[in-house]
């Protein structure tokens, strides 16, 4: 499942190619791609709609048309949003094709069919209001309104996030994965952030000091910014940007997926454990 950096890479690519473009036609090629609604409604709503913005919160991605609805895009396990010349994308896994006013087309390719496009009501962003930056432009899908702001957003309130973390007695790794506490951090970047912060994943968030929790959040932001610079993390060909290129942050991972291998910092073997049902990696020497 793509995490924040991978979704942000896609968002930036879509923003470059879609903003100001109008959907001239939409073809649903597979019903599962619109399983949360009627394909006919999606097609009629998007036809002649002009993209005004491409936005994201955590792992959630959506297109804004300046209307009372938004197009939420779930990438799922293998979803790809590719912008190409008409007919250039010949994959048998194309689920939706949308013609653009500049003559190109947007293709939603999804091999495993866990992803989808869905129309959602646009509602004011409660997290933006709480951070004191509310504006008429701060709208998001109704079903995302409970998702906390992520560490790379302008509306992110680190002190409030630390307070939410401090109220949880669960392992700090588990708390980092709670999208209502802080969004966008998945299994990969939680492990990497905790390594950078020097904190063991099983420690109770409630028992960590506020400065330590701030350090964990700052480390998460640093790790994800670094991943963004490298195009995200690609372990297979299923995660690509809008041009079909893969990211290469996987080469920079310090602990995730490296169980039994030597720590790049101290040489001790990386430990693999299960925390909250999730495979977790850490260095017992570098993390306390």
From Swiss-Prot:
**SMART domains, sorted:** Fapy_DNA_glyco (SM00898), H2TH (SM01232)
Co-factor note (free text): Binds 1 zinc ion per subunit.
Positions with a binding annotation for DNA: 93, 112, 168
- List the active site: 2 (schiff-base intermediate with dna), 3 (proton donor), 59 (proton donor), 278 (proton donor)
Q: Which cofactor does it need?
A: Zn(2+)
Which domain of life, per UniProt?
Bacteria
**Reaction(s) the record says it catalyses:** Hydrolysis of DNA containing ring-opened 7-methylguanine residues, releasing 2,6-diamino-4-hydroxy-5-(N-methyl)formamidopyrimidine; 2'-deoxyribonucleotide-(2'-deoxyribose 5'-phosphate)-2'-deoxyribonucleotide-DNA = a 3'-end 2'-deoxyribonucleotide-(2,3-dehydro-2,3-deoxyribose 5'-phosphate)-DNA + a 5'-end 5'-phospho-2'-deoxyribonucleoside-DNA + H(+)
Q: Which SUPFAM superfamilies match?
A: Glucocorticoid receptor-like (DNA-binding domain), N-terminal domain of MutM-like DNA repair proteins, S13-like H2TH domain
**Alphabetical UniProt keywords:** DNA damage, DNA repair, DNA-binding, Glycosidase, Hydrolase, Lyase, Metal-binding, Multifunctional enzyme, Zinc, Zinc-finger
* Start and end residues, zinc fingers (FPG-type): 254-288
Q: Does the keyword Metal-binding apply?
A: yes
Q: What is an annotated GO biological process for this record, any one? A: base-excision repair
Which is an annotated GO molecular function term of this record? Answer: 8-oxo-7,8-dihydroguanine DNA N-glycosylase activity
What's the EC number here?
3.2.2.23, 4.2.99.18
Which PANTHER family does the UniProt entry name for this protein? FORMAMIDOPYRIMIDINE-DNA GLYCOSYLASE
Assembly description: Monomer.
What function is annotated for this protein? Involved in base excision repair of DNA damaged by oxidation or by mutagenic agents. Acts as a DNA glycosylase that recognizes and removes damaged bases. Has a preference for oxidized purines, such as 7,8-dihydro-8-oxoguanine (8-oxoG). Has AP (apurinic/apyrimidinic) lyase activity and introduces nicks in the DNA strand. Cleaves the DNA backbone by beta-delta elimination to generate a single-strand break at the site of the removed base with both 3'- and 5'-phosphates.
Give the family per the record. Belongs to the FPG family.
Record protein name field: Formamidopyrimidine-DNA glycosylase
